[in-house]
């Protein structure tokens, strides 16, 4: 039995990194792994007005139902004026003892970071979710990068080639049948675009709605699940007629009911992606995907031949029109989306890769 500890600030939130760790922890076979997940609620930052998403009850329920032992600790502040982003007034070290574990699983940015820079004996498997920062810590035996682009950047920043492993984000996809919102919102005969995003102004992109404004007709609609309030303001300013906004949620059934409603996933994010959970979820429904260029370009690798990545809203609008009016192109993108999900992103494939890594580092 391998004893593994997951550690994450705000670890039961519905952000992408948090959901990755929650899914790995939940889906590991419990006849082979004893899984403890250390987490705290969101806390204010010192040195930034950024607000981390807080604990979501549905994510707590999900991991508990799958045999994960949740261990909650307290943090009063996260001090990002310190290079290691220290946790201030925390009882973490009262509840966590590294000698109790065979492996530590992280989900972090890449630079030396609290509390992992103080865990120096137990083997660490890092999951890195930003790019351009690398740390070669002696007991960090494997570093999981979530896209080829990110892996290349991590190695270029000084990361060890031997430690680097590319594994996409693991996602649990519920079976909800054909349940969708079309009848509820009287959208039965419309061609529907949509975007799912956390409520965060820092990642708001104006491009999807700017593009949709160019092509909107009485026979189209755009549905936003979650997302920054800036989207709602933008939709109002543009005078969009068929724009629907659904509240942020961590409940998988609602997310996938939303995705069942769409014809095309209209992705946008100001800083780009490494490996987007939202795009993977969309592909699990065989949805074609449109996106745009950004500083990080993991979305290009993800989408592949399941859609297009363009530079601005005018080109984005042209692809929207092609999706609507070129049936052969649209069907090809749907087929390719499903194939990419089955071949690359299916949960069972991803979890098996993590199992192999954990067994490897324990045997070192």
Segments (PLM) and residue ranges:
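Conserved donor-binding/catalytic core segment of Leloir-type glycosyltransferases
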Residues: 3-5, 182, 186-203, 209-212
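Short His-centered aromatic/hydrophobic patch
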Residues: 85-88, 106-111, 128
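Nucleotide-activated donor-binding/catalytic signature segment of Leloir-type glycosyltransferases, i.e.
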Residues: 232-250
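Acidic donor-binding loop of glycosyltransferase active sites
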Residues: 260-274, 287
